[in-house]
């Protein structure tokens, strides 16, 4: 089970032109995503008042930034029709780092949706009992656990640490498949509960703020980010996938990572004043610091939004 992506040569000139168009759009979109995530990362790290969800989004922006960097570089040989080829070690390192950031981003989205769901369903109890440094600990745990999984995959499926073990490699990819399914199911359940609470709760006529952002980001993953994970599972579990799905999944992965900053700034901007407000203020508003978060800011002084991590 090699981690290098092999694709069949396009059968016609039209197929080749289509593939090159998709790859070129992927590169351009990734470049725009680098800019957007870089701005979001800088604002979240420097200019935005810290709350637990800003810490989560800071980590998400960091994972997306690294993912897009690896994504852009990894598809250059195919875009140039193999006129430029990276050494095997460099290519494998790029795609494993890209997959690592993909799993980190997915895990962080699950953590965000779960916390927001709990804060919305049980505002008083959850906000009062929430440990002060929970967000920092959860983010650190996700990065470390995903790194260990990535190292195990690298050791079992490549020659980084000796001869690969194909049996162990197959077992690990089955574990990844179960993990991906569990994370997606958890995300769907928490987002559904959050949606029902937002639409049917007593706060449905009030500003939605951060819960809306969470729901939109989850929908973005399900439609744009999930195909990339399905492609990697199908490739490494020897499932047959058509060539067009390969290009489609890579393009949609770029959309997924590049569109998040646009969602942040779109939701945080005031209608009629878009592109006129400071980006810091727009991002602050998207995080819910100027409205309620989890339906109740007044439920707990020093609660989930106002608490500095």
Swiss-Prot record:
PROSITE patterns: G_PROTEIN_RECEP_F1_2 (PS50262). The keyword Cell division does not apply. GO terms for biological process: G protein-coupled receptor signaling pathway. Glycans are attached at residues 19, 236. It holds the Pfam family 7tm_1. Orphan receptor. May regulate nociceptor function and/or development, including the sensation or modulation of pain. This is Mas-related G-protein coupled receptor member E.
């Amino acid at each position: 089970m090699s981690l290098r992506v092999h694709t069949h040569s396009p059968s016609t000139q039209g197929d080749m032109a289509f593939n090159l168009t998709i790859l070129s759009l992927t590169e351009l979109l990734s470049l725009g995503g680098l800019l957007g995530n870089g701005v979001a990362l800088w604002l979240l790290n420097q200019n935005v008042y810290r709350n637990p969800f800003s810490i989560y989004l800071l980590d998400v922006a960091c994972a997306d930034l690294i993912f897009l960097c690896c994504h852009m570089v990894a598809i250059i040989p195919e875009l140039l029709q193999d006129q430029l080829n990276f050494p095997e070690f460099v290519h494998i390192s790029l795609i494993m780092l890209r997959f690592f950031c993909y799993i980190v981003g997915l895990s962080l989205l699950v953590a965000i949706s779960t916390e927001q769901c709990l804060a919305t369903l049980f505002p008083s109890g959850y906000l009062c009992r929430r440990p002060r440094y929970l967000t920092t600990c959860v983010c650190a745990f996700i990065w470390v656990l995903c790194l260990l999984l990535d190292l195990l995959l690298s050791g079992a499926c490549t020659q980084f640490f000796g001869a690969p073990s194909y049996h162990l490699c197959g077992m690990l990819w089955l574990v990844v498949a179960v993990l991906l399914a569990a994370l997606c199911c958890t995300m769907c359940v928490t987002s559904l509960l959050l949606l029902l609470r937002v639409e049917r709760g007593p706060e449905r006529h009030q500003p939605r703020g951060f819960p809306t952002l969470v729901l939109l980001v989850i929908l973005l993953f399900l439609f744009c980010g999930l195909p990339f994970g399905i492609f990697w599972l199908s490739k490494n579990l020897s499932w047959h996938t058509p060539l067009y799905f390969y290009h489609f999944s890579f393009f949609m992965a770029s959309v997924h990572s590049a569109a998040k900053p646009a969602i942040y700034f779109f939701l945080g901007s005031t209608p009629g004043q878009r592109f006129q407000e400071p980006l810091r203020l727009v991002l602050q508003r998207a995080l819910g610091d100027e409205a309620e978060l989890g339906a109740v800011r007044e439920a707990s002084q020093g609660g989930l939004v106002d608490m500095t991590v």
